[in-house]
From Swiss-Prot:
Reaction catalysis annotation: 2 a quinone + NADH + H(+) = 2 a 1,4-benzosemiquinone + NAD(+); N,N-dimethyl-1,4-phenylenediamine + anthranilate + 2 NAD(+) = 2-(4-dimethylaminophenyl)diazenylbenzoate + 2 NADH + 2 H(+)
UniProt name for this protein: FMN-dependent NADH:quinone oxidoreductase 1
PANTHER family: FMN-DEPENDENT NADH-AZOREDUCTASE 1, FMN-DEPENDENT NADH:QUINONE OXIDOREDUCTASE
EC number: 1.6.5.-, 1.7.1.17
Protein family (similarity comment): Belongs to the azoreductase type 1 family.
InterPro entries registered for this protein in UniProt: Flavodoxin_fold (IPR003680), Flavoprotein-like_sf (IPR029039), FMN-dep_NADH:Q_OxRdtase_AzoR1 (IPR050104), NADH:quinone_OxRdtase_FMN_depd (IPR023048)
Native source species: Rhizobium etli (strain ATCC 51251 / DSM 11541 / JCM 21823 / NBRC 15573 / CFN 42)
Enzyme category, top tier: oxidoreductase
Cofactor binding note: Binds 1 FMN per subunit.
GO molecular function: electron transfer activity; FMN binding; oxidoreductase activity, acting on NAD(P)H as acceptor; oxidoreductase activity, acting on NAD(P)H, quinone or similar compound as acceptor
Length: 204
């Protein structure tokens, strides 16, 4: 059975990244009978930010944690389990101030854990989350995949860096961009993204 982890992060009711990502996850599920989609709406149900109790707890062996510390890492443990169980991960975000939504960053902070999803060695860090395929649906008012504004796109390099640090290197970005350039440009961008979703699903 294939597991697809869908992470949506836009707080906007009229979000375009969310429905396109959800459509991709559903199409991938339909291509492989028996597949399941595990969805985390990070905007509708925000995750806890890491705090002093959490950072102290994850530095201890699980058996040495107090009841309060166990409770502090419970959500993180669940998120990590979902990540390891997933074969495919679909992430949606808008480009907000040149980066990802804070709700998605909080998910990353909860799953990036030394000794769990990556480890330090004498020869450098080693990612422990391997064999995953990631699709990132990124929506933006301007064009940031190429051209003069491309250096301002910190979202894709950041996601590739942090996911790569965890061991996930097979990452494709589906851009839904130029949405602020008028109805015709927006329609074209949405159509291109939907076409790519169809291509990915057919090739799955």
């Amino acid at each position: 059975m294939s597991s697809i982890l869908l992470l949506t992060s836009s707080p906007r009711a009229e979000s375009l990244s969310t429905p396109i990502a959800a459509d991709l996850a559903e199409k991938l599920k339909n291509q492989k009978p028996g597949s399941v989609v595990v969805r985390r709406d990070l905007a509708a149900t925000p995750l806890p930010h890491i705090d002093d109790l959490f950072t102290g707890a994850i530095r201890k062996p699980a058996e040495a944690r107090t009841a309060e510390e166990i409770a502090a890492v419970k959500t993180s443990d669940e998120l990590v389990a979902e990540l390891f169980a997933a074969d495919t991960i679909v992430i949606s975000t808008g480009l907000i101030n040149f980066n990802i939504y804070s709700s998605l960053k909080t998910w990353i902070d909860n799953v990036a854990r030394a000794g769990v999803t990556f480890k330090y060695t004498e020869s450098g860090p080693v990612g422990l989350v391997t064999g995953k395929k990631v699709y990132v649906v990124l929506a933006s008012g301007g064009v940031y995949s190429q051209g003069p504004a491309a250096p301002l796109n910190h979202a894709v390099p950041y996601l590739k860096s942090v996911l790569g640090f965890l061991g996930i290197t097979d990452i494709e970005t589906i851009y839904v961009e130029g949405l602020a350039f008028g109805p015709e440009a927006a329609e074209k961008a949405i159509g291109a993204a939907k076409s790519r979703v169809e291509e990915i699903a057919l090739a799955a």
